[in-house]
């Protein structure tokens, strides 16, 4: 837009739509000579009068035309009518017609509907009714414009007058009026709403629509865009038509138009009325009155539009005439001509035009707004405007136009003033708005905006003269530029750039001016192209004068036409006007509807006719085909008859000779003849062979036995075939024999019964096979393949029919299972008994084997022709139950399919019943009921229930019964429903028993879907229908009835259930499904599911007191009989009372007991790593709680906790095992060895494999608290669980996952944890439990236990972590255990180390505890969770602690947690999960414990369970252990470095090692492997971490860095420091206690003393301090780990290593490398960084030596990042290491500063600084990113999100992530502190302790946000890590110092900014 002419404001505005047209018209016409002003005033007056009269006239004309008086719109209505769609006659055609003359765009905007179709392609520019509407929106302007147009365009006088009138009348209501215009009237309301709603839009849109046209587009863009801003006003003020400087825009395009438009607004209308409008009016008038009005409005708009367009399209004259009334056109022409000509022709002119435009812009914009529509209207006609002749003819000559324009310019000036004044608010606004759009033109426009009225008017006037001059100058150009104008109009862009292509743009501008001038103007322009600007002025003036004359004439005419129209014109719309409009709209709608209906009817009729025609054609086609077929058949018959006639008489040789001769002759004569001869010869030979074969076999038919004998058949056939191998004919005798045999068999079967039938069928098949019809196509039920294999096609058809018949019989008799085996197996395998045999007891064996030929497609799901894949068991065994097959098939097609699938009908009853049961399980249906009532519509006997079959073969039936009885054990009574599903036969039963599971799935190899398979396999649909129907019936039938309650349900019916059942039946009657639902909903808590059949059977049993014999009568017996056990005093309908009475207390007690037991279980199951048991899972709290205990391989056992029944369902489904609907406990009876093993491990007390109750589990795992003993990663959670148990109560709820509930105890979170574990494995962070569930968990936790002490805090975490389980973890630092457990357990595969992994999903919550997901399990408890509420951490401390831990722990463990989440959540938190918050021990163990879960958990346990003293003692012990571990881990880490995968576990230990400086060297070796083994890290690292962490923990503990030992620990240390500051007790913090004031120093000392172990702790601490420092004042972390903070700085590399270690535990095993390792890790992660890590390791060593905190910091960083991005972590760690090194060098002071800042309480600042550093320090950022982003960098934001609740953690994690960058500052400070052993850390630590809590929270947020922000930079920078050189680190350090400072500043100044990322 702006590209147009810089001079033309409008150009820019309008550039969009039309290109330069609008632009060219922009400035011209701005200047209005006094004369023009006077003229404009006169014109305005004239216009008003004219409008009134025109309105009257228009009304009269409208009525004369037969218009609906309601549709007619007065004044405003007229304008509206312009828009009004009601005036369909105003349609584009009308506009086009009337304005086409004028080359109006009106065509485009003819339809009221088109109001919205501004961009209509039809319109050259998009000029449309919308344009008109927009113009009308600026009705007052439009009125003026229309008046002008009418004046200009006498042709349009009608329209013009109408529109002008309407415009005038609706000056205030123009917007609505416009909508109400004839065209738009129907949609007036809609349009109004749109326009009113979006006046700017409509104006702009409309303008844009207009702009769609040449000038119009531009005007619209500019006016439109401007109009958008302005148009709203304009739209609001329909008067604003004038305001819309649409025309002026065009004037800008066409110079004059703008003034004209302005004038249009007021004077312009007058002028329009005077002269210019006439033309428009003429064009408009051509349209119907309303159309005319609309057109007039359009015309005005058009006129203006056309003016612009004309310039653009060279249709300016036309545009002027049509769109820019002569006046508008003239003025526009003059102004635009001058401006445009100058502007378009000359950039100067354009500039002036812009100025003019500025002046005009104001008015012009107003005008434009109003005229944008006009322009639009004229857009289409614009191109027509190209036809100057048309314009000339239509409009006044150019000269007139020019003169008019001259007048207009003046008038426009006045008009502009008036209009601007009138519409200044709107118009001016519009202008201003428009102007902004054309900022190039904005100067003038803005000026106009500023002085919309006065300035715009003045400018308009002034610029009018200038424009006129320019137009005069450019008028010449106009004509010359007419083409250019056209081009511009065609190419709005060029016009848009009218300023750009000066010459062409100017030309178009001039052209636009001419167009604006109107036809007359255009002529004048044409004539004037050679003339000078003076001529232009003269022409303008003349045109204006002419326009005035025209206006006067119009006035007279109007006066004649209508008197007293003025009042109408002036009057504002009343409600009746709106009513009329609405009526018109409705009428239009009705008309439209009628049209639509008519159209629809026509279409329907057409379709009907077409359909009939098609049918007729089809019939003809069929007839033709029939004819052809008959001809062909006749020909074939004739051929064969002729051949037969010839053959007998001729010898083969003779015929051959003849044929040969014939062939030769024919070859000579005709190739065809030869061919025919050859064919004939072949046919004769074939017949001969056939005859001979028949003769040969003549004996065969006499000996059916022989025929049946496959050998004989084969031999005979072979003999025959060998003679003539070419022919494979079926011996006729054979077929006959076969047919007879089949028929006899069928007859026999019918007589004897289904079994016989089966035999017969089988024998028939066998016979077929014997006969040598190996194919035995008939075997295919479908018959589709019946002829497939038949030797002779002819006979084949017969055999096919036979087979079909037989099949039908078989199907009837066998219910499509006659060949059940065959359904998968081919029925008629050549083998003989192939399929039906199986059904028939006769050939079960062969059925098993015979599967080669798919004989019958029983409705097996796969429809496979498997050769009895299950054949032996199913086929051979199943054959007997043909009936069953039939019955089952009938009963349930699915079962039938299944039966056939499994073995065919043999299994039918038993199998089918089984199938139904198994169908769900993919076992054959064991439809006891189905078998009981085989409704297969098999043959009569089989068709009858299979019982008939049984009658036939009672022994089999009995056997089946026995089998069914036995089967329940074997099968999980699929439905529990089927008593002994009487196995069809023993074989079937055996198969069922043997294949209960196998049959269902393996038999067919495909599991059929009952419906699909049946249908697919069904021989015929009828059968399938029968099957289905039968199935339903069969279901009702119970085969052998076994009390479903006994064997049918996995769980025996309890008394409560019996009572409930009886009561429900009593109340509800035998509505078994309803009762089942009620029972299930009531018994949800027990996880017991009773299906309707079960309920029915049980009720029968209860009522009948029989084993289930009365099952059939269950329905009958259910209601009437009373149940003895029914609670007394419960009347009918009291079931609800009963349930309430029985259920309420039971549920409460059950839930309580369940929860307590779950907690106990959690303790017990301290997740022995060996637990093969999937674990006890709190499946969900359905009512209160549903527990699903999965023991062993997933066999479900009911946990008979008072109310607790673990449903096999859930277990099985959870395990993926087939489910019995939880009915059969017996089915579970045999416990697999693996299950026993698992159970023995998990439930040592329950080795008998009996059903375990949660109590049993609890008893079994009482030792769970021995975290140390349970360190095994296998069940690390068990360890944690116990330690967490104290918090576990809370944890369960906190985690937000049910598993979380046991935060500590995995068992509680078993299900969740399992999921978590899975999630952890797959790095899938788990979503948090629903709030209500969390709430429930919280409540339960609180309610449930004393150990739920943490529950409140946990619940808070749960609430906090509500969004994410991790978050849940967050709230409960202790909850960490829960969340951690919950999440962590799942998080890491290694048992509850998995918890650490779990922490990963819990990461959020774990993060809350500080990235120490698992550590959070413990750590959060200690301090990890804000709501640690753990005994470990006081609730308040928990929060700060959590913050701290999150910050501190968050740094290393927190990040790992995130990392873990992001990463495989293997490392997730293991390294970081150091339970920094938990205890320093936990922290120490955290990385490893996290990794190991158990070791951590032990730490966690003790901290969790133990408060200060216990924890301290425990921490001390753990520290010792930790030290041992650290030593071990150092060793392990060294080799783990080599073995990354498992070393990860060790490396997590290395993490601990990194926590302890000792391990840092060890860690180093693992670094390279660890990075490589990062993915495995999570599982192994957890294990190793546990193992190592324990030593580390002990070491760290010994070091006195409760949190230092591990990055997690360090994180904990931060929290612990805070906590210690609060609680100095925490075991890990005992040293911290000592160090509380001097913690940092002590930590530094310890770290130094510990070497890397301390460094690691320090790193952790530093990480925490970073996190805390970043999130919390590092000082705080420094406080708690002032030394850590200090060491971190010096040891940033070490810290990186440590972090890495910590994180490595979770992710890379950088943690083992500790600081060095982390450095290596980052490098190794980035790529071949191991050497770099080695260097870094050296650096770390140096760092460790320097302060050991440096290694710690890198460790923390790594820890932070590693979980998030093992690879990313490595780079970031590397970077961090480098940075740390630099920092150590440069940043020691900086670090000190940072630490000091942290201490200053600027934890946020430090966080921010760190965050800033993060971005600046790619390495550190990488760490942050890695840490935060569980996945790579992205994890960070996630971490932040996850850490939202764990703000501390999040920030901790973020700071941990930041540490690299933050470490730049924080770590730098730390490293400096550490290196310099500055007590600053320590000293600052205490100082920042309070800040830490706040800062951590604050800073964490900031840090997290910051980190998120810096993540990108981190991501970018991670590449740096690849540069492991110390130089890089130094550079980073050097860079970081400023960054630290900046970051500090940022953190202090804009903590919230961190959210940016």
Swiss-Prot record:
Region (Disordered): 108-208, 261-287, 323-373, 449-469, 833-909, 928-950, 1107-1131, 1282-1314, 1344-1367, 1449-1644, 1687-1768, 1804-1840, 1876-1957
SMART domains: HSA, SANT
Source species taxonomy: Eukaryota, Viridiplantae, Streptophyta, Embryophyta, Tracheophyta
Keyword DNA-binding included in the entry's annotation: yes
Localization (cell): Nucleus
Basic and acidic residues bias: start-end ranges: 140-151, 1805-1815, 1913-1922, 1932-1942
Family to which the UniProt record says this protein belongs: Belongs to the EAF1 family.
Ranges of biased composition (kind: Polar residues): 261-270, 333-342, 355-372, 884-898, 1116-1125, 1290-1314, 1344-1358, 1459-1472, 1479-1492, 1501-1510, 1582-1595, 1604-1618, 1635-1644, 1691-1722, 1734-1758, 1819-1832, 1876-1894
Tissues where the protein occurs: Expressed in leaves.
Protein name, as recorded: Chromatin modification-related protein EAF1 A
Subunit description: Component of the NuA4 histone acetyltransferase complex. Interacts with ARP4 and SWC4, and (via HSA domain) with TAF14 and TAF14B.
Gene assigned in the entry: EAF1A
GO biological process: one example: chromatin organization
Biased composition (Pro residues): 1563-1579
Cellular component GO terms held in the UniProt record: NuA4 histone acetyltransferase complex; nucleus
Record-annotated SANT domain positions: 1049-1105
Compositionally biased residues, Low complexity: 1523-1534, 1545-1562, 1759-1768
SUPFAM superfamilies, per database record: Homeodomain-like
Record bears the keyword Nucleus: yes
Organism annotation: Arabidopsis thaliana
Miscellaneous information on this protein: Decreased expression of EAF1A leads to decreased levels of H4K5 acetylation in the promoter region of major flowering regulator genes, decreased FLC expression and early flowering.
One of the record's GO molecular function terms: DNA binding
Domain HSA, chain residue ranges per copy: 563-641
UniProtKB keywords: Chromatin regulator, DNA-binding, Nucleus
SS bond partners: none
UniProt xrefs under InterPro entries: EAF1A/B (IPR044798), Homeodomain-like_sf (IPR009057), HSA_dom (IPR014012), SANT/Myb (IPR001005)
């Amino acid at each position: 837009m702006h590209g147009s002419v810089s001079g033309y404001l409008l150009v820019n505005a309008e550039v969009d739509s039309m290109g330069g047209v609008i632009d060219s018209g922009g400035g011209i016409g701005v200047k209005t000579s006094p004369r023009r002003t006077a003229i404009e005033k006169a014109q305005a007056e004239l216009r008003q009068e004219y409008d009134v009269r025109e309105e009257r006239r228009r009304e009269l004309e409208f009525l004369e035309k037969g218009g609906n008086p309601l549709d007619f719109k007065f004044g405003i209505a007229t304008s509206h009518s312009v828009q009004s769609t009601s005036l369909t006659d105003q349609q584009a055609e009308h506009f086009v017609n009337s304005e086409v003359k004028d080359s109006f765009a009106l065509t485009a905007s003819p339809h009221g509907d088109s109001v919205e179709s501004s961009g209509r392609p039809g319109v050259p520019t998009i000029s449309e009714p919308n344009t008109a509407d927009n113009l009308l929106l600026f009705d007052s302007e439009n009125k003026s414009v229309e008046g002008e147009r009418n004046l200009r365009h006498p042709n349009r006088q009608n329209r013009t007058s109408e529109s002008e009138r309407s415009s005038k009348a609706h000056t205030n209501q123009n917007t609505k009026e416009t909508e109400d215009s004839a065209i738009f009237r129907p949609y007036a309301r809609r349009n109004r709403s749109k326009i009113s709603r979006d006046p700017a839009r409509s104006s702009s849109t409309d303008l844009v629509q207009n702009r769609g046209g040449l000038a119009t587009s531009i005007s619209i863009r500019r006016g439109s865009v401007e109009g958008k801003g302005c148009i709203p006003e304009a739209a609001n003020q329909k008067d604003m038509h004038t305001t819309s400087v649409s025309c002026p825009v065009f004037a800008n395009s066409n110079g004059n138009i703008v003034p004209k438009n302005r004038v249009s607004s007021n004077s312009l209308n007058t002028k329009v009325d005077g002269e210019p409008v006439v033309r428009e009016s003429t064009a408009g008038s051509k349209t119907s009155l309303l159309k005319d009005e609309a057109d007039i409005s359009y015309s005005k708009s058009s006129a203006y539009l056309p003016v612009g367009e004309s310039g653009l399209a060279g249709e300016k004259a036309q545009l002027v005439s049509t769109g820019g009334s002569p006046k508008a056109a003239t003025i526009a022409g003059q102004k635009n001509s001058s401006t445009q000509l100058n502007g378009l022709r000359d950039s100067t002119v354009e500039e002036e035009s812009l100025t003019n435009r500025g002046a005009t812009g104001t008015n012009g914009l107003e005008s434009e707004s109003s005229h944008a529509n006009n322009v639009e209207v004229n857009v289409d006609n614009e191109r027509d405007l190209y036809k100057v002749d048309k314009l000339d003819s239509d409009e006044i000559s150019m000269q007139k136009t020019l003169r008019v324009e001259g007048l207009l310019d003046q008038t426009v000036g006045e008009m502009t003033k008036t209009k601007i004044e009138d519409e200044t608010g709107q118009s001016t606004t519009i202008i201003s708005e428009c102007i902004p759009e054309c900022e190039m033109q904005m100067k003038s426009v803005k000026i106009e905006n500023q002085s919309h009225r006065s300035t715009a008017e003045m400018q308009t006037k002034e610029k009018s003269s200038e424009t006129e001059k320019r137009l005069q100058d450019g008028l010449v150009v106009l004509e010359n530029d007419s083409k250019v104008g056209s081009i511009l109009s065609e190419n709005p862009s060029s016009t848009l750039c009218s300023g750009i292509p000066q010459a062409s743009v100017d030309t178009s501008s001039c052209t636009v001016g001419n167009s604006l001038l109107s036809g007359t103007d255009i002529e004048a322009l044409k004539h004037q192209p050679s003339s000078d600007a003076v001529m232009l002025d003269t022409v303008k003036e003349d045109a204006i004068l002419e326009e005035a004359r025209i206006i006067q004439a119009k006035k007279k005419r109007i006066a004649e036409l209508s008197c007293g129209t003025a009042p109408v014109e002036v009057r504002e719309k009343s409600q009746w006007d709106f009513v009329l409009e609405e009526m018109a709209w409705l009428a239009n709608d009705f008309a439209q509807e009628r049209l639509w209906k008519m159209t629809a009817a026509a279409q329907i009729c057409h379709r009907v006719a077409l359909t009939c025609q098609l049918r007729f054609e089809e019939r003809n086609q069929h007839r033709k085909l029939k004819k052809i077929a008959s001809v062909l058949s006749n020909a074939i018959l004739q051929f064969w008859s002729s051949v037969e006639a010839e053959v007998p008489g001729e010898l083969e040789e003779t015929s051959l000779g003849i044929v040969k001769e014939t062939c030769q002759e024919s070859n000579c004569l005709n190739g065809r003849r030869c061919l025919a001869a050859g064919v004939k010869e072949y046919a004769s030979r074939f017949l001969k062979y056939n005859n001979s074969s028949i003769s040969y076999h003549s004996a065969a038919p006499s000996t059916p036995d022989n025929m049946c004998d496959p050998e004989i058949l084969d031999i005979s056939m072979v003999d025959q075939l060998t003679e003539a191998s070419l022919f494979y004919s079926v011996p006729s005798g054979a077929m006959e024999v076969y047919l007879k045999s089949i028929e006899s068999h069928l007859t026999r079967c019918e007589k004897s019964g289904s079994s016989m039938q089966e035999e017969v069928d089988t024998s028939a098949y066998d016979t077929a096979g014997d006969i040598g019809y190996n194919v035995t196509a008939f075997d295919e039920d479908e018959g589709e393949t019946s002829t497939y294999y038949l030797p002779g096609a002819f006979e084949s058809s017969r055999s096919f029919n036979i087979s079909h018949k037989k099949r039908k019989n078989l199907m009837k008799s066998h219910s499509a299972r006659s060949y059940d085996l065959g359904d998968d197996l081919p029925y008629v395998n050549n083998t003989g008994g192939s399929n039906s045999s199986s059904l028939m007891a006769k050939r079960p064996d062969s059925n098993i084997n015979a599967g080669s030929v798919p004989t019958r497609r029983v409705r097996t799901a796969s429809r496979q022709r498997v050769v009895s894949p299950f054949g032996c068991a199913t086929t051979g065994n199943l054959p007997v139950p043909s009936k069953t097959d039939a019955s089952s098939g009938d009963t349930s097609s699915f079962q039938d399919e299944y039966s056939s699938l499994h073995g065919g009908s043999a299994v039918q009853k038993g199998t089918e019943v089984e199938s139904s049961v198994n169908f769900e399980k993919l076992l054959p249906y064991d439809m006891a009921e189905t078998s009981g009532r085989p409704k297969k519509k098999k043959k009569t006997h089989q068709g009858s229930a299979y019982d008939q079959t049984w009658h036939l073969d009672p022994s089999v039936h009995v056997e089946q019964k026995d089998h069914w009885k036995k089967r329940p054990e074997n099968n999980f009574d699929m439905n529990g429903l089927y008593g002994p599903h009487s196995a069809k036969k023993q074989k079937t039963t055996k198969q069922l028993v043997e294949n209960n599971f196998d049959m269902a799935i393996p038999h067919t190899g495909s599991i059929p879907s009952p419906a699909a398979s049946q249908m697919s396999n069904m021989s015929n649909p009828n059968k399938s229908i029968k099957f289905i129907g039968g199935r339903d019936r069969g279901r009702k039938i119970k085969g052998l009835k076994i009390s479903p309650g006994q064997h049918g349900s996995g769980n025996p019916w309890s008394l409560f259930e019996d009572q409930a059942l009886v009561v429900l039946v009593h109340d509800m009657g035998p509505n078994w499904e309803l009762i089942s639902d009620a029972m299930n909903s009531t018994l949800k808590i027990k996880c017991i599911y009773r299906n309707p059949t079960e309920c029915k059977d049980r009720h029968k049993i209860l009522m009948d007191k029989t084993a289930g014999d009365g099952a059939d009568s269950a329905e009958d017996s259910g209601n009437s009989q009373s149940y003895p056990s029914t609670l007394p005093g419960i009347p009918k309908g009291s079931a609800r009372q009963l349930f309430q009475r029985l259920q309420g207390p039971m549920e409460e007690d059950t839930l309580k007991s369940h929860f307590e037991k779950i907690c106990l279980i959690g303790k017990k199951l301290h997740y022995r790593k060996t637990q093969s048991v999937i674990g006890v899972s709190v499946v969900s709290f359905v009512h209160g709680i549903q527990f699903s205990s999965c023991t062993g391989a997933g066999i479900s056992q009911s946990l008979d906790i008072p109310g607790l029944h673990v449903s096999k369902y859930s277990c099985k489904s959870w395990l993926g095992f087939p489910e019995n609907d939880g009915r059969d406990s017996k089915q579970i009876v045999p416990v697999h060895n693996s299950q026993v093993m698992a159970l023995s491990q998990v439930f040592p007390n329950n080795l008998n494999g009996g059903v375990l109750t949660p109590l049993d589990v609890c008893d079994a795992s009482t030792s769970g608290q021995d975290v140390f003993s349970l360190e095994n990663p296998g069940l690390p959670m068990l360890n944690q669980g116990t330690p967490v148990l104290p918090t576990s109560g809370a944890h369960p709820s906190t985690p937000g996952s049910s598993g979380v509930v046991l935060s500590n105890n995995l068992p509680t979170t078993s299900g969740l944890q399992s999921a978590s574990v899975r999630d952890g494995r797959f790095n899938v962070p788990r979503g948090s439990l629903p709030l209500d569930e969390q709430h429930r968990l919280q409540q339960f936790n609180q309610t449930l236990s004393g150990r739920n002490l943490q529950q409140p805090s946990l619940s808070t975490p749960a609430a906090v972590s509500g969004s994410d389980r991790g978050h849940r973890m967050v709230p409960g630092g202790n909850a960490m255990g829960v969340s951690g457990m919950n999440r962590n357990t799942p998080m890491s595969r290694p048992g509850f180390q998995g918890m650490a992994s779990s922490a990963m999903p819990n990461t959020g919550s774990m993060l809350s505890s500080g990235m120490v997901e698992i550590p959070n399990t413990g750590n959060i408890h200690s301090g990890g969770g804000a709501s640690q509420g753990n005994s470990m951490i006081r609730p308040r401390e928990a929060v700060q602690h959590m913050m701290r831990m999150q910050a501190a722990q968050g740094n290393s463990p927190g990040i790992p947690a995130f990392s873990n989440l992001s990463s495989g959540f293997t490392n997730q938190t293991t390294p970081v999960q150091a339970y920094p918050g938990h205890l320093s021990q936990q922290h120490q163990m955290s990385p490893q414990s996290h990794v190991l879960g158990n070791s951590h958990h032990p730490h966690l346990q003790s901290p969790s369970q133990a408060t200060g003293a216990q924890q301290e003692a425990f921490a001390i012990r753990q520290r010792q252990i930790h030290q041992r571990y650290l030593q071990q881990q150092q060793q392990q880490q060294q080799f783990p470095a080599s073995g990354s995968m498992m070393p990860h576990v060790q490396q997590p230990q290395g993490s601990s090692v990194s926590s302890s400086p000792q391990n840092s060297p060890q860690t180093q070796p693992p670094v390279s492997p660890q990075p490589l083994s990062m993915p495995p890290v999570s599982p192994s690292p957890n294990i190793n971490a546990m193992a190592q962490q324990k030593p580390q923990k002990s070491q760290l503990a010994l070091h006195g860095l409760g949190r230092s030992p591990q990055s997690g620990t360090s994180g904990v240390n931060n929290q612990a420091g805070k906590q210690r500051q609060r609680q100095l007790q925490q075991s890990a913090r005992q040293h911290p206690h000592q160090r509380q004031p001097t913690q940092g120093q002590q930590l530094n000392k310890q770290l130094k003393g510990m070497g890397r172990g301390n460094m690691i702790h320090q790193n952790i601490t530093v990480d925490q301090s970073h996190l805390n420092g970043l999130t919390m004042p590092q000082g705080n972390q420094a406080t708690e780990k002032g030394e850590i903070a200090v060491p971190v700085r010096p040891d940033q590399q070490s810290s990186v290593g440590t972090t890495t270690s910590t994180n490595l535990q979770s992710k890379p095993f950088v943690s083992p490398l500790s600081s060095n390792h982390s450095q290596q890790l980052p490098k190794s992660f980035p790529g071949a960084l191991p050497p770099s890590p080695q260097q870094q390791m050296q650096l770390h060593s140096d760092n460790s030596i320097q302060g050991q905190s440096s290694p710690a910091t890198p460790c923390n960083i790594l820890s932070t990042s590693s979980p998030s991005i093992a690879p990313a972590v490595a780079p970031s760690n590397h970077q961090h290491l480098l940075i740390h090194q630099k920092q150590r060098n440069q940043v020691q002071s900086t670090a000190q500063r940072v630490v000091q800042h942290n201490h200053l309480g600027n934890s946020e600042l430090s966080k921010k600084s760190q965050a800033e550093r993060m971005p600046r320090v790619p390495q550190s950022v990488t760490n942050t990113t890695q840490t935060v982003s569980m996945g790579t960098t992205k994890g960070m934001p996630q971490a932040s999100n996850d850490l939202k609740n764990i703000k501390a953690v999040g920030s901790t994690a973020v700071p941990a992530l930041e540490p690299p960058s933050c470490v730049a500052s924080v770590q730098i400070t730390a490293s400096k502190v550490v290196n310099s052993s500055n007590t600053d850390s320590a000293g600052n630590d205490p100082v920042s302790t309070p800040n830490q809590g706040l800062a951590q929270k604050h800073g964490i947020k900031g840090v997290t946000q910051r980190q998120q922000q810096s993540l990108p930079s981190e991501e970018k920078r991670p590449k740096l890590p690849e540069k492991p050189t110390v130089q890089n680190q130094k550079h980073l350090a050097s860079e970081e110092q400023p960054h630290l400072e900046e970051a500090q500043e940022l953190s202090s100044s804009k903590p919230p900014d961190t959210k940016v990322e």
